[in-house]
Amino acid sequence: MSDSPILIIGAGISGLVLAQYLQRHNVAFKIFDRDSAIDARSGGWGLTLHWSLPALRELLPEHLVTRFPETFVNKEASARGDTGRFQFFDLRSGDALYNIPAAERIRVSRARLRQLLTTDIDVQWNKNLQSIESTADKITAHFQDGTSSTGRLLVACDGARSRTREILYPDVQMNQLPVQLLGASTLYSAEELGGVESIDPFIFQGSHPESNVFLFFSFLDTPNNFENSSKDRYHCQIIISWADSKEIPVPDANAERIALMNKLTDNWSEPFRSLVHKLPGDVEVRSIRIEDWMFRLGREHAHPRAVLMGDSAHTMTMFRGEGANNAIVDVLDLVTRVDMCQPSSFDSGALLSSLAAYENDVFTRAEPSFLNSRQACLDAHDFSKIEGSPLVGSRELKKSD
């Protein structure tokens, strides 16, 4: 059984980091993803990596660590040691109310980070998990294309809409939060930004004290950042959100969504108002219903050699940027508890004990992040609650005892 592979379901951040660790230590594995290719999905998101950076450096081979700058949304700012202020603004007055401190953090393109993490990794694409079959010492993943793969451990890294989680816990439902979000990404020139690039090289956020409509702004790329970057324009992500209590339905038509964004932000101060009002008429506006979910300790399932990791274990709101950081440390916790290089680690009794310890580590660390992220989401849409909220609090690693 020592040659039996680790099965990784999902080639997101945690799945690829785990794959890199296993490859570095010559441990057999297979990694599968439901997408047709790494760039199958359009649209860009940025990730802020802070308290997970030591774990990430420990897990990855040095030659990938040295290539981190290939993922930066603003290499120039990062090179000069600028970690950003991550300010929170009163969108009526334009005043900066809070800075979010961090000893160390980098802002990366999720797409570029995934590209880096696939280096020398053979991802099997177009693999939609259909079912799982278990015996005492093996676990088999069956895919919709009729193929299957058997291993000694299955690690579910298949995200917020985890098929693995559905199989393990068929009665579980995501928690819908009373918040609606509209988001778009576009290219703006420095002139169109109106000085926004001087506020922060990475991200900022804010809310209007009367309407309680929230703004999240981030740079996804900057001029001349990479060879394929725009020479004179900034790639920007613009998100606005509001509470369901405002009873504002989201229209289906894209043009009507842009019109709604303009209406909701019409009383914002500059330059924040123009960030929304200058959106091109043909930009795609995505509607997202905010949801979260957190696994519970001690919940039994039929597949003891399967374990959840990353968003499949703890789907968090985006309002503290802690999901990816927890996912990375999940990997370190797993390989700390399960000695992947030692065949006896996969004996049934030893593995069950190690996975229970891993789940306890994850729950102890991630539950506070999960709860803080939920509270930050709710507070973002009630200006009176922002003072002292996790929305503007520091981000730090909670270590297990």
PLM region spans:
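Conserved N-terminal helical subregion
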Residues: S2-I6, L49-L168, Q173-L187, E247, ...
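Conserved mid-domain beta->alpha element of the FAD-binding
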Residues: I8-A28, F32, V155-A156, L182, ...
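Conserved Rossmann-like nucleotide-cofactor binding loop
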Residues: S14, A37, R161
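C-terminal helix/juxtamembrane-tail motif
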Residues: L18, R374-D401
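Short glycine-/acidic-enriched loop or helix-start segments at secondary-structure transitions
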Residues: L18, R41, S134, T164-I167, ...
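Conserved N-terminal glycine-rich FAD pyrophosphate-binding loop of Rossmann-like flavoproteins
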Residues: S36-A55
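Short, solvent-exposed loop/turn segments at secondary-structure boundaries
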Residues: R41-W45, P249-D252, F319-E322
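Conserved FAD/dinucleotide-binding core of flavoprotein oxidoreductases
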Residues: Q87, L91-R105, S109, G183-V283
